[in-house]
């Protein structure tokens, strides 16, 4: 029975993932046609490669339709409810580092912590006649962090379909929850990260579907990739 390994379909994530696999002894033979999203591995007839977007990989792992995948831990936690029951993080791969953060306008000088933000949220409706609006693509992580961890209840999530960091300046939101690696884009949009506003530190990970844990082949592949990281 073959094992399906889902990999990022483009960009630096794809390049770095292929390098990690080659270091572990898995040389991926790319298709001649860029529109072909399947590939093979030299000498591994029972290992199928499937190229997907990072968010699709997280979803398919949750469904159990792929056995292993490389994606960001932020996407795993955001995409899958009860993620630990459905998937397992096999290895952190050491690239694709980014943080999911709470960021507010720099002009909110008195707001530096989540406790300050709680006060703002409680006061916002009385002052403005509406709830505090948070633009984000990470609604699950936002709800968990605001409501469950910090007890902040009076806010409204605004789905971000474009560049989240531009939402406050555009007037479609008051603040944001977004992913950042250097913080330069946030600073360019005059936003600041709250002192205790890091929701999750993320990086590219090798992830397995729980339903595949009975497969010795899946365990073998994961172990070989982990060993390759230590070379």
Swiss-Prot record:
Which pathway or pathways does this protein act in? Amino-acid biosynthesis; L-histidine biosynthesis; L-histidine from 5-phospho-alpha-D-ribose 1-diphosphate: step 1/9
Q: Which family does it belong to?
A: Belongs to the ATP phosphoribosyltransferase family. Short subfamily.
Query: Which top EC class is named for this enzyme in its record?
Result: transferase
Which Pfam families does the annotation name?
Answer: HisG
Output this protein's name: ATP phosphoribosyltransferase
**Biological process (GO), any one:** L-histidine biosynthetic process
Identify the main location: cytoplasm
Q: Where in the cell is it found?
A: Cytoplasm
Q: How does it assemble?
A: Heteromultimer composed of HisG and HisZ subunits.
Question: Coiled-coil ranges per the record?
Answer: none
What role is this protein assigned?
Catalyzes the condensation of ATP and 5-phosphoribose 1-diphosphate to form N'-(5'-phosphoribosyl)-ATP (PR-ATP). Has a crucial role in the pathway because the rate of histidine biosynthesis seems to be controlled primarily by regulation of HisG enzymatic activity.
What's written under domain? Lacks the C-terminal regulatory region which is replaced by HisZ.
Query: What's a GO cellular component annotated to this UniProt protein?
Result: cytoplasm
Q: Which keywords belong to this entry?
A: Amino-acid biosynthesis, ATP-binding, Cytoplasm, Glycosyltransferase, Histidine biosynthesis, Nucleotide-binding, Transferase
Q: Which GO terms describe its molecular function?
A: ATP binding; ATP phosphoribosyltransferase activity
Q: Which gene encodes it?
A: hisG
Enzyme Commission number(s): 2.4.2.17
What catalytic activity does the UniProt entry give for this protein?
1-(5-phospho-beta-D-ribosyl)-ATP + diphosphate = 5-phospho-alpha-D-ribose 1-diphosphate + ATP
Q: Which HAMAP family match?
A: HisG_Short
């Amino acid at each position: 029975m073959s094992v399906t390994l889902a990999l990022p379909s483009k960009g630096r994530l794809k390049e770095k993932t292929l390098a990690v696999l080659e270091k572990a002894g898995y040389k991926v033979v790319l298709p001649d046609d860029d529109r072909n999203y399947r590939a093979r591995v030299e000498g591994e007839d029972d290992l199928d490669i499937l190229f997907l977007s990072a968010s699709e990989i997280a979803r398919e792992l949750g469904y159990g339709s792929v056995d292993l995948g490389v994606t960001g831990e932020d996407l795993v936690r955001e995409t899958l409810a009860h993620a630990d029951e459905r998937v397992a993080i096999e290895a952190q791969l050491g690239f694709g580092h980014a943080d999911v953060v709470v960021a507010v306008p720099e002009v909110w000088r008195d707001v530096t912590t989540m406790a300050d933000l709680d006060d703002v949220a409680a006061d916002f409706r009385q002052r403005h006649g509406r709830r505090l609006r948070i633009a984000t693509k990470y609604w699950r992580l936002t709800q968990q962090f605001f409501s469950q961890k910090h007890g902040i209840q009076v806010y409204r999530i605004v789905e971000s379909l474009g560049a989240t960091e531009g939402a406050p300046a555009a007037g479609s939101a008051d603040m944001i929850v977004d992913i950042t690696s250097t913080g330069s884009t946030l600073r360019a949009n005059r936003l600041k990260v709250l002192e205790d506003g890091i929701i999750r530190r993320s990086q590219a990970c090798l992830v397995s579907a729980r339903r595949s844990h009975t497969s010795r082949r899946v365990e073998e592949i994961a172990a070989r990739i982990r060993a390759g990281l230590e070379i």
